[in-house]
Amino acid sequence: LLLVALAVAYAVPDPRGVIINLEAGEICLNSAQCKSECCHQESSLSLARCAAKASENSECSAWTLYGVYYKCPCERGLTCQVDKTLVGSIMNTNFGICFDAARSEE
């Protein structure tokens, strides 16, 4: 009976997740896996890890085809001011600065 109870306890899924719902600093393959929705890679040779989104006046990336960013996208409510190009989307080099569009309209 004790073995059955232990087996059930270990079978209950961890809410943190192994493949999705990953915390900052955990290794990822795509931004969809991260709670923050940013899978960040320092260089093409480094492992990608979940990271916080970019804050106001920080460097940011526009949406990328791959779901892995060299610069994280902006936090909710902010806009990444960047000149988007097709080549930049493919090469993951569409970088800009996060700003609050609502504040700049005032």
UniProtKB/Swiss-Prot annotation:
Locations listed in the record: Secreted
Superkingdom: Eukaryota
Gene Ontology CC: one annotated term: extracellular region
Tissue: Expressed by the pancreas.
Entry binding sites for taurodeoxycholate: W63
UniProt keywords, alphabetically: Digestion, Disulfide bond, Lipid degradation, Lipid metabolism, Secreted, Signal
PROSITE patterns: COLIPASE_1, COLIPASE_2
Pfam families per record: Colipase, Colipase_C
Keyword Nucleotide-binding attached: no
Propeptide residue range(s): 12-16
Keyword Cytoplasm appears in the UniProt entry: no
A biological process term (GO) from this entry: digestion
Family: Belongs to the colipase family.
Protein's name according to its UniProt entry: Colipase A
Organism: Equus caballus (Horse)
